[in-house]
Amino acid sequence: MFVYQIRRDVQVYMDNMIVKSRRKDDHLDHLKENFNTLCSYNMKLNPSKCAFGVTIGKFLGFMVSQRDIEVNSNKIQAIMEMAPPRNIKEVQCLNGKVATLNRFILRTTNKCLPFFHTLKNSFEWTAECKQAFDDLKAYFSSPPLLSPSRPGEELFLYLAISLIVVNVSLVREEEGVQKPVYYTNRALRGAEERYPPMEKLAFALITASRKLKSYFQAHTVVILTDKPIWQAMSNPEAAGWMALWAIESSKFDVQYRPCTTIKEQVLANFIAKFTYMEG
């Protein structure tokens, strides 16, 4: 229906739609085009749920502007005002609130590991849990900003692994400055924890390509790493799942480059260092 407009000047998620324009002078033309499309399909909009000429607003629970994506202040406030959990149900509530903000949190699983441990045995709010809870609130005292990707630009991916977690940071570059686009991570389970380091890196890449599929489909994604991940995945003697991951990742325009600048190496080291420390 909006095949020509989506990702150009329209973003759609289920029944939520945004018509966006970089230049104010183009906005009326974009609106007219989209209204004509709606009319051609005899579709109507609810005026009470429409807003026009908005420079910043809430979309899918986030505050979105031309330059940044902010955490919804209401979601931050809900965490900041929470008292330390007193039982498993309250820990589950805390984990649920954090899960809605995953994309804004570097190393979410590492930060929340003490909370998960309380769910495995009889409830006990330990000193480690208290420290993690305080650290989480401190993190949100200066809400992080994410930068929306631009059509056609390269995006850069940093991978980090530990014994039990893989972490991924997707960033873009603007005027020589790298800005985060999305953070994601995944706890390793069962046999995944026993993967050799190179297989964990490959698994981190596949995890990212699945979680961030829309970015991988729309952009060239550059993996900034000094590890020979592609060679390991395409090695005929590698484990069977490595070959499958190689095939899966080949569907996207993925490139591999070493960290050549100081800022790239600093960021890569920062992510890796704290992943291992907390893992």
Regions found by a protein language model. Give the residues of each.
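Retroelement reverse transcriptase polymerase core
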Residues: 1-223, 228-239, 244-245, 261-263
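C-terminal functional segments of enzyme domains
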Residues: 240, 254-257, 261-279
